[in-house]
Curated annotation (Swiss-Prot):
Belongs to the influenza viruses Matrix protein M1 family. A motif (Nuclear localization signal) lies at residues 101-105. GO terms for biological process: viral budding from plasma membrane. Its main location: virion. The keyword RNA-binding applies. Changing residue 144 to L: In strain: Isolate mouse-adapted. Most abundant protein in virion. When expressed alone can form virus-like particles in transfected cells. Homodimer and homomultimer. Interacts with NEP. Binds ribonucleocapsid by both interacting with genomic RNA and NP protein. May interact with HA and NA. Cannot bind NP without genomic RNA. The gene is M. SMART domains: Flu_M1_C. This is Matrix protein 1. Pfam families: Flu_M1, Flu_M1_C. It comes from Influenza A virus (strain A/Philippines/2/1982 H3N2). It is a peripheral membrane protein.
Length: 252
């Protein structure tokens, strides 16, 4: 796996699924391929994206700044600086300075990542802030190692939280989660269907599913009534894709 592929993998792991994730993935690919060299336009686009947490925006802004060649005098963006200040916690800043001193002696991506993984996400973000604000300089490889370690820490806590929700025995939470997944799947079907004539059927199925979820929420239904909703939708989606000559078996 190449260095940039690894960075893209880690960064995308902390971005919530949805159309925005696909947009961010495309921009990362363009930046890494040298196709997008307007750092100011990129960061302005990033600043106005909804849904993303300030920290995720900060990490993405840091990655864009590391990768896109920019003029010496280009201003640092306030929203990135604020996100990478470790919540203003002096303990985070102290640890960030110690980590920075270690990273300065490191020259490899994997070496930097190993060192960084023993620090908290707050300290890692503060260390990124030091580098972003030009208070410290490390090689690009080392900075990417720091980025990936931060994303791994964040993704680990997101995964723990997700696992707790999936494993919950509370029928109301499970019911709502199934309806949310069905609704999200329906939205994805509508986007994938596009405007072709054959898409009408897929659009109809997706639309009916969303109406059903809205009705179930409006009138209140038994927690078991949502069982299989998403799977039924995915089956419909795969049938539609086969007819269109697309083979995608990895949705489930």
């Amino acid at each position: 796996m190449s260095l940039l592929t690894e960075v893209e993998t880690y960064v995308l792991s902390i971005v919530p699924s949805g159309p925005l994730k696909a947009e961010i993935a495309q921009r990362l690919e363009d930046v890494f391929a040298g196709k997008n060299t307007d750092l100011e336009a990129l960061t302005e686009w990033l600043k106005t994206r909804p849904i993303l947490s300030p920290l995720t925006k900060g990490i993405l802004g840091f990655v864009f700044t590391l990768t896109v060649p920019s003029e010496r005098g280009l201003q640092r963006r306030r929203f990135v600086q604020n996100a990478l200040n470790g919540n203003g916690d002096p303990n985070n800043m102290d640890r960030a300075v110690k980590l920075y001193r270690k990273l300065k002696r490191e020259i490899t991506f994997h070496g930097a990542k190993e060192i960084a993984l023993s620090y908290s996400a707050g300290a890692l973000a503060s260390c990124m802030g030091l580098i972003y604000n030009r208070m410290g300089a490390v090689t690009t490889e080392v900075a990417f190692g720091l980025v990936c370690a931060t994303c791994e820490q964040i993704a680990d806590s997101q995964h723990r939280s997700h696992r707790q929700m999936v494993a919950t025995t509370n029928p109301l939470i499970r019911h709502e989660n199934r309806m949310v997944l069905a609704s999200t799947t329906a939205k994805a079907m509508e986007q994938m269907a596009g405007s072709s004539e054959q898409a009408a059927e897929a659009m109809e199925v997706a639309s009916q599913a969303r109406q059903m979820v809205q009705a179930m929420r409006a009138i209140g239904t038994h927690p078991s009534s949502s069982a299989g909703l998403k799977d039924d939708l995915l089956e419909n989606l795969q049938t539609y894709q086969k007819r269109m000559g697309v083979q995608m078996q990895r949705f489930k």
